[in-house]
Amino acid sequence: MNVMIKKISLITICIAVLAFAVFAAVETMTFSKTLKKEIDSKLFYETKKIANQMSMVFENAEGSVDTLCAEIEHNFDVHRQLQSPEYINSYMADYSPVIRDALADIEDSQGLYLTFSPDITDRNGAYEIWYSYDRNGELTYTDATSNGIYYESFEDESFPTMHYYFGAIANPGEGIWTEPYMDSDIGQEVIAYSRAVYSDGILIGVAGTDIYTEHTVRLINDMNTEHDGMIFLLNENNDLIIASDNAKRTDILDSTPLWRSVTKNTNGRD
């Protein structure tokens, strides 16, 4: 009888252990799924928050330039300019403070300008209104001829600093973003958003804003990510424009297969 009791007890213990193991496995799986769901949710939230932060920077730049273009189209008399080439001088004097004050109100933009088309000027001067922040953070009027080149650059569409101009002209009615390039007039690498301004089908010029690359990198590095997460700014082809410093310290940017894996199903921003 004692042997039978021992056998029953042993069987009972085995069943209890097995039941506990099954229960523990189910609980572990449930906890893992819950934990994964929480992690995925937090990662999605963090990613969306960072994307929204960067979107605000670019949308502010786009909105400011688009508004500026609408104002110029409305208040610049292109027909008067074609009849009296000196009209542009008085216009620049009157409108220069407007561009200066507009730049002061655009958060995270470091330059704002209106480049007039040479085709409506007498080419006797640099017809451009350009304000930018210098390295000391001072808002200053910027000389577009400081690198010794002005009208020559309008003859070469491949000139690095002129993509903002020719790219905008090639896309009438919409704004364009450039890839990062070195602007020799101010000694800064920038990305630019620009848009061509027309009146009665006549090109007045191109308005645009600059965001210094180092400023964008600083914005990206200042964004808090979980577990030292990496941030990338891509164009519509998933080509890298700017990356956070911790991403540059890895081999992710040099590994084509890894980069394709990272950018798979990702919509870049131009």
Segments the model singles out, each with a brief description of its role:
Residues 128, 192-193, 228-230:
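Short loop/turn microsegments at loop-to-beta-strand junctions
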Residues 6-12, 19-93, 101-104, 108, ...:
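Juxtamembrane extracytoplasmic/periplasmic/luminal helical "stalk" adjacent to the first N-terminal
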Residues 175-180, 266-270:
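PAS and PAS-like sensory modules
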Residues 214-270:
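Intrinsic low-complexity, intrinsically disordered coil/linker regions enriched in small/polar
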Residues 186-224, 236, 242:
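Conserved beta-strands of PAS-like sensory domains
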Residues 97-106, 167, 218-223, 265:
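Amphipathic alpha-helical regulatory segments at dimerization interfaces
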Residues 102-174, 180-187, 239-260:
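Extracellular/periplasmic ligand-sensing ectodomains of membrane signal-transduction proteins
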